[in-house]
UniProtKB/Swiss-Prot annotation:
Gene name linked to the record: rpl32e
Stored NCBIfam families: PRK08562.1
GO CC annotations, alphabetized: cytosolic large ribosomal subunit
Pfam families given in the database record: Ribosomal_L32e (PF01655)
PROSITE patterns: RIBOSOMAL_L32E (PS00580)
Family, similarity comment: Belongs to the eukaryotic ribosomal protein eL32 family.
GO MF terms, alphabetically ordered: structural constituent of ribosome
Entry's Gene Ontology BP terms: translation
Keywords, in A-Z order: Ribonucleoprotein, Ribosomal protein
Name the UniProt record assigns to this protein: Large ribosomal subunit protein eL32
CDD domains referenced in this protein's UniProt entry, alphabetically: Ribosomal_L32_L32e
SUPFAM superfamilies: Ribosomal protein L32e (SSF52042)
Keyword Cell cycle: no
Organismal lineage: Archaea, Methanobacteriati, Methanobacteriota, Stenosarchaea group, Methanomicrobia
Superkingdom of origin: Archaea
Length: 129
């Protein structure tokens, strides 16, 4: 990983630490309302009017740097694999694989062996590295 990417990963880590938990308005009051974010649209809504005590609104400024957005903390791009044939499409220089949960133990062992042979990093191998 080059120094600029490493710096951007550190920036992302700091930004994620400062990011508030974006919660749905009044989700703590009603059991039927999930915490998942919904934009407040009421005409008199306190959260929409940006009252500090009512929680933060989702805004562009909370986002990660574009160069490292969506990347795994190891610096690799995450690729979901569900067959051995899909391994041939992976570029080990910037992509790492994650084996799908629907794969059985026997096929997973074959994929792990083939990935190790090709020098591809596996993110959910089940082994501590």
């Amino acid at each position: 990983m080059d120094p600029e990417s490493r710096r951007l990963f550190n920036v992302r880590k700091v930004q994620k630490g400062k990011k508030p938990q974006f919660k749905r308005t009044c989700s703590h009051k009603f059991k039927r309302l999930d915490d998942n974010w919904r934009r407040p649209r009421g005409s008199q809504g306190k959260q929409r009017r940006k009252y500090v005590s009512k929680g933060a609104l989702v805004q562009v400024g909370y986002g990660s740097p574009a160069a490292v957005k969506g990347l795994h903390p190891s610096g690799y791009s995450d690729v979901l694999i569900s067959s051995i044939a899909e391994l041939e499409l992976v570029d080990p220089s910037y992509e790492a694989i994650r084996i799908a949960g629907t794969i059985g133990a026997q096929k997973k062992a074959l994929i792990l062996a083939k990935a190790e042979e090709a020098g591809i990093k596996v993110l959910n191998s089940g082994r501590s590295e």
